[in-house]
């Protein structure tokens, strides 16, 4: 096997680099901006976000009373300020004879996340796969990378995690592979938490003599949630107590089924220390990448993702970037998250100065006017003035915008079932299995518990990152939370619930599941009125006068009219309520009053009017 460090650009001549840079097409950022006017266009109601009933009624040219009545008849108690969700607006549009469509308004604040690159197929070239090596501490991640890139990086001590974040490229059998060398799954999950699709393939390192450990399981959780293909590398096969079948079984329990067991996950056996299985691993990566058909356009200005950024004493703000598409070059004008600048200097993974970087290439640049965040998208354009304006606006918007709450635990699946995502950590396996058993026995119609992760040990920052990504509630049993992790959870908007009595967890989860369900709306009888006198009014119709027999009558409540024990009308809203000339909110038993009903005038003296409210009740 011959493995050697790949050069960033094939340097047959300096003229080739210059030709690549000069021939790149520009990215027209302004053409990506899209202003969406909410309203009816050609019989279609177009909207960008949720609206109140008052706002929605004006946009579709309907009286708000029609909308409120429709929702009341559906059992939904509401008013002008009630916020309608996407489903409700769609239902109302269909009720009033309109089709509906949600569109995304793209502006300077969100264009990096929504920009679409429509590269012609003939401009696309194969790009190297980006691979993240993950696994438990001391199972051989760093040794594996050392062996692959043929450099003697000092091995980490047992119990520690590689501190630097970087990326490396190797060439094998004329194929480039980019390895994302992280402190483990932490950086990987941070990227996913902000929506950055950084990694194509995950290589999961498992020690043959140790099997799956907590960090291995965490790595699997992150990879599965991100839907990234997994290749398992069983390391330390030279150990006497290697137990492959045990590892296959443990992987199957985590929904990773190996090819040997009839699944699709490739497993490579070897020893990173003794250079065994490396060829097979690289071949597996290339095969997986071929199946994925990874391509990008190198013939335009570049865009990509930020790996990490920091302040360098000598160079100012520096950022480690990954080129996803296009070609990045020195002297390019670049916007990275909120910050912009001119690429003054660019180095590759060997810290060797380079002039250009192709897709899937990791680089470090200097020249920005601030420090971006990990996961920030970036883009290059020829218009320096525009980038400066965008940078200033994005920074201003960030200052004005309140921090979003990433800890919302409520999700809804495609069947309309409400889901509560939970990450569970306990002190030992016995309590873990007991709690999982109790939670599996909970049955709440219309709601479902989804255990995103269940493991032994203290809560850590990786758990918080996964909770943020999956919008999960964190539940811990008989374990402590360090002040560092607690502060991190607070900063991420994640709720941690700590228990020491198992049944309290079951009760709380059951309560939360019931709480996320939409309330059940029922009719609550509040009074009755006998009609004794009628008046006609030219503008408001028939006014019914009567005495309250029981309970009370309220304005905006509903009425059901009984005439000789026969129901004449129901669901009629009480529009106005008066005592003499005074408008009143309610009248109690024994009092006289006059009132009108919405869309009903056919009263008869002697009618009994049953008064009720529609109230929401929680699920019990």
UniProtKB/Swiss-Prot annotation:
InterPro entries: EF-G-like_DII (IPR053905), IF2_II (IPR044145), IF2_N (IPR006847), P-loop_NTPase (IPR027417), Small_GTP-bd (IPR005225), T_Tr_GTP-bd_dom (IPR000795), TF_IF2_bacterial-like (IPR000178), TIF_IF2 (IPR015760). Residues 160-164 are annotated as: G2. GTP binds at residues 135-142, 181-185, 235-238. GO terms for molecular function: GTP binding; GTPase activity; translation initiation factor activity. Residues 126-295 form the tr-type G domain. Residues 235-238 are annotated as: G4. Its main location: cytoplasm. One of its GO terms (cellular component) is cytosol. Residues 271-273 are annotated as: G5. Residues 135-142 are annotated as: G1. Residues 181-184 are annotated as: G3. It comes from the Bacteria. PROSITE patterns: G_TR_2 (PS51722). The keyword GTP-binding applies. It holds the Pfam family GTP_EFTU. Transmembrane segments: none annotated. Keywords: Cytoplasm, GTP-binding, Initiation factor, Nucleotide-binding, Protein biosynthesis. It is found in: Cytoplasm. One of the essential components for the initiation of protein synthesis. Protects formylmethionyl-tRNA from spontaneous hydrolysis and promotes its binding to the 30S ribosomal subunits. Also involved in the hydrolysis of GTP during the formation of the 70S ribosomal complex. Belongs to the TRAFAC class translation factor GTPase superfamily. Classic translation factor GTPase family. IF-2 subfamily. PANTHER family: TR-TYPE G DOMAIN-CONTAINING PROTEIN, TRANSLATION INITIATION FACTOR IF-2-RELATED. This is Translation initiation factor IF-2. It comes from Malacoplasma penetrans (strain HF-2) (Mycoplasma penetrans). The lineage of its organism: Bacteria, Bacillati, Mycoplasmatota, Mycoplasmoidales, Mycoplasmoidaceae.
